[in-house]
Amino acid sequence: KYGMTLIGWWIPGHESLISSKPIPDVASIKDFKFRSPPGMESMIFTALGAKPIVMDFGEVPTALQTGLIDGADYSSLATNYAGGHYEQNKYATYPGFHSMPADHLACNTKVWNKLKPHEKGAMLAAIEICGRTITSLVERKNAEAVKALTAMGVTLHDWSREDRLKFRNAALGAWEEWKKKSPEAAALIEIHKAYMKANGIL
């Protein structure tokens, strides 16, 4: 449909919220004013009483420093730590509960079809290695960040299973809306729900 071929994908790992106030459970995000990406996530948090504000990455540091926002959905714990976001904001969610983004590499199909078999094989092998490397690297960096942040006095909130289920159930409403956007979206969401139910996390 779009003339693109998927080469491969990888999961960078769970993201962690940055916060200037305690967020130990789902009830605590009521009126939580934070930076959020547009779309589905903003819908879910709004349904739970939070006040997501859509803003660019570049605006987040100043917004946090000036108190314009209470917190931010920015990136992984390690990336947030490396950016210095916990020097002033002493609370975070970890392990994350709300987002596990997936990145991918796609190629123009016409260009892909012109490649020789060994060239395609090399790219497919490289992207698989890249994916495994990124995932393990993020896990290691997050573990290092946990130690450093704990030493800094940052509180890491690990939501209970009950609170995680409350959040996921709230997400179902947004998912139903997004299913209407396209047959592909509906199929993807149903696959996701089936996986979560099979693994006892929904």
Regions found by a protein language model. Name each.
Residues K1-L202:
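N-terminal secretory/targeting leader peptides
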